[in-house]
Amino acid sequence: MTKSRPPAVNPKNFTSMKTKYFFALIIAAPLAFTACNSEVPKEKAAAVASAAQQVYVPPGKLDDYYAFLSGGQSGGVFVYGIPSCRYIREIPIFEPRAGLGYANNLGTESYKRLRDSGPIWGDTHHPVLSQTDGKYDGKNLWINDKANGRVARVDLHTFDVAEIKRVPNIQGAHGLAAYLPSCKYVFVNGELEHDFEKNTTDPANYRSVIAFLDGQTLETKFEVSFVGNADIASSGKDGKYVFVTMYNTENGQSSEGMIERDRDAVGAIDVPLAEKLVAEGKATVINGVPVIDETKIPGVLTRIPVPKNPHGCNVTPDGKYVLASGKLSPTVTIIDAHTLKVVAEPEVGLGPLHSTFDNRGNVYTSLFVDSQIVKWNLEKAIKGDPSYLVDRVDVHYNVGHTKAAGADTSYPSGDWLISLNKLSKGMFLPVGPAMPESQELIDISGDKMKVVAAFPSPPEPHDAVMVSRQVLADKVAQTYQLPAKATKLGEEKVVRNGKKLEVFMTCIRSKFIPESFEVHQGDEVTIHLTNVETVRDMTHGLAIANHGINLACDPGQSQDATFTAGKPGTYWYYCTWFCSALHLEMRGRMLVKNDGEPVSDSLNPGAVPANVEPKASYE
């Protein structure tokens, strides 16, 4: 059944329709769309078989793309293979993951980095990949923490977190993008306005900031402050402007107050001008960061009026235009990225949220209310050609972000698109009142879009980015390079300093060295574990019974754990990652003694000599 187009909307007379579209948005229930014409079973079977063939990647073969999906309230990033939609791994960032030994033990570098940056939890929304010459380069991934005003950098050489930094003066670090073409900055939008200068509760003092961070160190270099909220971010391609959608120019403190005006804006920040103002000392230093107040220094931020409460902000691959999705308007506003003039405002459907691109001049916009992806031609829309709408496909259900492969670069691939849906409503086996998140893979290589797969994920991906295997796979490390602090085979030792004990330990199939050590009850124990394996994927773990300790140590890696020894007795430690036929035998003892009892600082105290047969009794 072909869906009718939404009624025409004159942006100048948007007021009369604001209630209709606003309430259509907030109460829209996900609908399953069924075809009116019954399909011939053979044709349907052939279509299903064709889709299955497209996404099938045989065991032992590799996917064409890495897909990085933000984890939302799970606090990390999920990695999938495309087109198979196979879950590959999670990159934990703002939340501990005991199974991966991430930030779950005192003493680990990941715990210290996370603790020093703020709360032990985060809300990740927008993954961003580094680029060189308009193409992904496979070096870095950046991600925001909306809840706690932080940004993290992941080193894609190891898929490890390299940096986490708190951004001063910001609440709701939401939209995130890399400043192009250099990536010398990543910039992040402060969505939640507040008084960051005087710390009052008076809304008259509320402001938000857009912060520019060094792309490597994540140190905040400067900020631009303004009244209102900044939502999604995107960069021009020539180093001049970066763009953000801005809503709540009313400075309202309730949902009703935030939608009173018929027009909000896209903000264009002149980055070279901002740098010049900072260099000339015209910014005010607030909480250690130069802040440019755009209300006092004109020109650094230009507001381009668009329909109220815009959401998505996307720059086209050629850098000519920036698109602002209407959300409460059934339109997408097309803005010249150089003149900052609106050139068109085509209607696309109900609840447009985000747009992405192929390599043939087409735009794909997610429609939250319609539960669709709509394909439309950019140049035709600009010229006013009524045939600009090309295709629509139903998704399941209530899509938020959508992202095509390579769409953030100057060279999109034009083959695959992911629809990140907000509700699944029976798409998967029931697992309780809450259902898994639903993502769908869409083939966009032809004239017509085709949904070829649906796959669940943990909660809750907001955005995604896809990079070719050819760009990244060969750059990923086989093993870690042993750091200088690493304990080498034959250098294991126990060092005691009063009530503090350090154990310098190695692990290799299938043995911990030492296999025992002695401590007093209440001692502060730090284990420095080094995996001396040289073979990829030979990970070892270290769990200590009844002490809540689990380390994960990849080949060539060192990890530390600090804890307090419990009551007297024997506590076994063992390897938590299956590594060999003698995996169960890969264990040792922590011998905890009462204060005053003698303890040994030698390796393997209390061990039974290998040539002595232990006593045993059998029934």
Please name every model-derived segment.
Residues C36-K493, T562:
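Predominantly soluble domains enriched in secretory-pathway, periplasmic, or organellar proteins
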Residues A24-A32:
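Bacterial N-terminal signal peptides
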Residues V494-E524:
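N-terminal edge beta-strand
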Residues L301-T302, A344, P514-F517, G548-C553, ...:
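Beta-strand-rich interaction surfaces with strong enrichment in secreted/lumenal proteins
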Residues E163-I164, H528-S558, A581-R589:
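Histidine- and aromatic-enriched segments that form or immediately flank copper-ligand environments
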Residues P11-F23:
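Bacterial N-terminal signal peptides that target proteins for export
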Residues V79-G81, P514-V535, S558-K567, Y571, ...:
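Beta-strand cores of secreted/periplasmic/IMS beta-sandwich domains, seen most often
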Residues L489-E492, C553-E619:
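Extracellular/periplasmic metallocenter environments
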